[in-house]
Design a protein with these regions (language model features):
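Solvent-exposed alpha-helices and their adjacent loops that cap or buttress functional pockets
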Residues: 80-82, 107, 121, 141-142, ...
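Acidic/histidine-rich catalytic neighborhood of metal-dependent amide-processing enzymes
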Residues: 122-194, 243
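Glycine/serine-rich anion-binding loops at beta->alpha junctions
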Residues: 112-127, 209
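Acidic-glycine-rich active-site phosphate/pyrophosphate-binding loop
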Residues: 94-110, 173, 177, 190-202
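Acidic/His- and Gly-rich active-site-bordering loop/insert found
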Residues: 2-117, 138
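Short coil/turn connectors at secondary-structure junctions
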Residues: 83-87, 103, 110-111, 143-147, ...
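Metal-dependent amide/peptide-bond hydrolase catalytic core
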Residues: 1-3, 13, 20-23, 39-48, ...
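Residue-level marker for buried hydrophobic side chains located in beta-strands
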Residues: 87-89, 177, 206
């Protein structure tokens, strides 16, 4: 019965409408439209719904400066917080496609497949989540548990501005479900994902003339490259390391005094996360001494 009720919901129309709305992670205007569409759709559920301002976030630019980063608002719905059993349902409204990207509108590939920005990842999942919750609310057993829904606007760029909201919503929950598509061809549900950390290392050296006094310089690009190689050596089963980008350099006749190295690490366990953090601190200290 629940499946039939969920199937009767207008999921396809919602996905098409939402996919037509560009909500790239940096498109604040588009995210505001998308959050309003979602708030309107999820207002069909009981409870208290609000759009939450993003937490303050900074990033390191190519000049090694810490600058603020703007993000969209996040949707937060709380239903029956007094119930003894509590669940968390999460998703994201942003996509990887900026407003300038040519991939903007959904289209049918054949009678059964719709292709469009965010259709799978994960506006389709949001429609499924909403349909399931609306179907659940129609049965008498609905009162036996409460739940929170968090739909963030920055998942594709690391969820930094929504992390406090997600962490708070997760406390005291019996289980949590995220409505992204399965990573496996047969549709098997994933029980866990590795953690993910994005690191920016600002390396400051000492400038000098490459012809007159190169021995007085400390080459920041070389130091950053050395750090990149040593970070790469941390890779092991359960811990992936991706050295993603190196910003830096100067005219050919000047020893560069600044470089910014960007790295992503993904540990599968908290123990590997702690080991990686300790190793990173040790490697940074070692390169700084050389």
């Amino acid at each position: 019965v629940l499946t039939e009720r969920a199937a009767a919901e207008p999921m396809l129309g919602q996905v098409i409408l939402w996919s037509q709305t560009n909500s790239g992670s940096e498109n604040l205007a588009g995210l505001e439209v998308m959050s309003a569409l979602l708030a309107d759709a999820f207002s069909a559920l009981p409870g208290e719904l609000r759009l939450v301002e993003p937490a303050s976030v900074t990033r390191v630019d190519a000049e090694g400066r810490e600058v603020g980063v703007a993000h969209g608002r996040h949707l937060h719905l709380v239903v029956r917080p007094e119930a003894p059993l509590q669940l968390l349902l999460t998703g994201h409204m942003d996509t990887v496609y900026p407003a300038s990207h040519p991939f903007q509108l959904p289209r049918w590939l054949d009678d059964g497949r719709l292709n469009g920005p965010g259709v799978a990842d994960m506006k389709g999942g949001l429609a499924v989540m909403l349909a399931a919750l609306k179907a659940h609310e129609q049965q008498s057993a609905a009162l036996t548990f409460g739940y929170e829904v968090v739909i963030n606007s920055d998942e594709e760029v690391g969820s930094a501005s929504s992390a406090p909201l997600i962490a708070a919503a997760a406390r005291g929950k019996t289980a949590a479900l995220t409505y992204e598509p399965s990573a496996l061809p047969d549709g098997t549900l994933a029980g866990a994902r590795p953690g993910s950390g994005n690191f920016s290392f600002t390396v400051r050296g000492r400038s000098a003339h490459a012809g007159r006094n190169p021995e007085d310089g400390r080459n920041a690009v070389i130091a950053a490259a050395l750090l990149a190689l040593r970070l790469e050596e941390l890779r092991r089963p359960g811990l992936s390391v991706n050295v993603a980008r190196l910003d830096g350099g100067s005219p050919n006749n000047v020893v560069p005094d600044l470089a910014v190295l960007r790295v992503n690490l993904r540990p599968r366990t908290p123990e590997l996360e702690q080991q990686a953090s300790q190793a990173i601190a040790s490697l940074v200290e070692g390169v700084a001494r050389e």
